Amino acid sequence: MLGPGSNRRRPTQGERGPGSPGEPMEKYQVLYQLNPGALGVNLVVEEMETKVKHVIKQVECMDDHYASQALEELMPLLKLRHAHISVYQELFITWNGEISSLYLCLVMEFNELSFQEVIEDKRKAKKIIDSEWMQNVLGQVLDALEYLHHLDIIHRNLKPSNIILISSDHCKLQDLSSNVLMTDKAKWNIRAEEDPFRKSWMAPEALNFSFSQKSDIWSLGCIILDMTSCSFMDGTEAMHLRKSLRQSPGSLKAVLKTMEEKQIPDVETFRNLLPLMLQIDPSDRITIKDVVHITFLRGSFKSSCVSLTLHRQMVPASITDMLLEGNVASILEVMQKFSGWPEVQLRAMKRLLKMPADQLGLPWPPELVEVVVTTMELHDRVLDVQLCACSLLLHLLGQALVHHPEAKAPCNQAITSTLLSALQSHPEEEPLLVMVYSLLAITTTQESESLSEELQNAGLLEHILEHLNSSLESRDVCASGLGLLWALLLDGIIVNKAPLEKVPDLISQVLATYPADGEMAEASCGVFWLLSLLGCIKEQQFEQVVALLLQSIRLCQDRALLVNNAYRGLASLVKVSELAAFKVVVQEEGGSGLSLIKETYQLHRDDPEVVENVGMLLVHLASYEEILPELVSSSMKALLQEIKERFTSSLVSDSSAFSKPGLPPGGSPQLGCTTSGGLE
């Protein structure tokens, strides 16, 4: 990412947002240029490898600082997941050497049609927009905007051309903007002179570069007004009307009266709605929830956007209970027929949670999982639905692992995307966070490397570290967070190692908070081992990590998994650092690591895996000549000889302890091989 600076210069390699190696623009072929937007040039491009069309908005930046600020503010938008929001597909900064200009590039979904084309076509034909179609797509827009406002995200650039049509009955909000870009006064003033139509959708306060959720409400009100009046008002008249409303809202009354005279469908709803949306003072405007209430509860609007059916009349509990008395198949049928009623979904899932394992169709009943995931998607903002659905998925997974340990949990993009959306919709809900982390940890360990990469690209590593740091007082968050972190690291494919530099210090804080917690120590040792293999522990952190690993072994020597991972981590660090080796053998308050090795061997002497990892640590310690006398005086030579005599199989002599199971072993010294200054 670009660093701060005030002078124009060509960015060096790596100073950009996510993108492919090399110059990001090189993978696109420019087809043609659209009308320029308020902030820059819009290019229709084709990705050369896939032949997929995109729109790239190129925003010229005066300096690196401006570009990096805008990029940093826009990056979180890449993680949005909603059926009616078209998120940016890529963000990057590029340099145009021909004109010596720096550009922030925003790659978006390409579509031929938007609300703008629909309005213009009806305006030319002087025809009314179909009421059923308008209710449907307006419901989708309201749902998307409610989702954004729920996350405290402001669109800032709502207008008909930024609501694209994916199909005749499916629309998406597009081109979300940032505060940095939308408060560039010079750029806005230039564009306003070129095209006064563009600023006509903006709220009065937005003209002074003050944006809030209420400014989105004004813009949406202008869009609804244009859609309802396009059959009798031309484009210039409509633009002047929008501008006049900023000073004299009374001009709206005449238009509403004309709408009534022209018998515009749903005019009564719009007469109630639009004056409340188009108040000059933003504090007097209604919220997006109020808009939904007026149109879909008090009004008679209907939409395929089922989340709006939260406002429907509830199904009596007695009827629901009667319908849910059958087997799994009949319960799923009820869930599908009443998909828009969250109370029905809750009762159905609670009924499924009580059913015995033999009735659930284990190991993983695909149809049941699909229905539960769909329910989570449809009711993503209903916390009780999310909690119950995750509980049911964990219940199914737990039962499956008990009765069918060889079974793999189904995991596809729909499932992971839904789980991530749940985290995003309810960022402060700890019980949900813990369950989602647990589900993702289990599925990640059973899936391919691509899933781990997908989750990392979605920002899950940073999410885990943020919550480990902010939720130290929550044991469940720490335990589930460490478990998921281990699962993400297990494949050894790390998209960005930089965030992992914080992990040793975070784990140190976790272990200090829970000094006698064996489960926490076990999870921590697993993460330390994988970090050591990945080279993600800095040299200045070696002593701290070695001390924590030894401390964990002393705490829970009876936990074989903890002991194995701790000795693997120690061996990995000692292999590359004499400082780490000295930390193992030095005498400290709890005793030396060498005495601990003896204790571990005696306790687990019949466990080949533990003995192998202990022996591997001894081999690496023996590679340092200055440590040899201490090893000999501590009878380590005799211990190593005993290990070699008792375990002559290849299990002990190979180096598989330093690889993920199933992957080829690394080049670690084999037990029994002569190393520099070894015990041989």
Curated annotation (Swiss-Prot):
The protein kinase domain is predicted to be catalytically inactive. The gene is STKLD1. It comes from Homo sapiens. Residues 1-25, 658-680 are annotated as: Disordered. Transmembrane segments: none annotated. GO terms for molecular function: ATP binding; protein serine/threonine kinase activity. Keywords: ATP-binding, Nucleotide-binding. This is Serine/threonine kinase-like domain-containing protein STKLD1. Belongs to the protein kinase superfamily. Ser/Thr protein kinase family. STKL subfamily. It holds the Pfam family Pkinase. Residues 28-297 form the Protein kinase domain. ATP binds at L34, N35, P36, G37, A38, L39, G40, V41, N42, K57. The keyword Nucleotide-binding applies. InterPro entries: ARM-type_fold, Kinase-like_dom_sf, Prot_kinase_dom. CDD domains: PKc (cd00180). It comes from the Eukaryota.
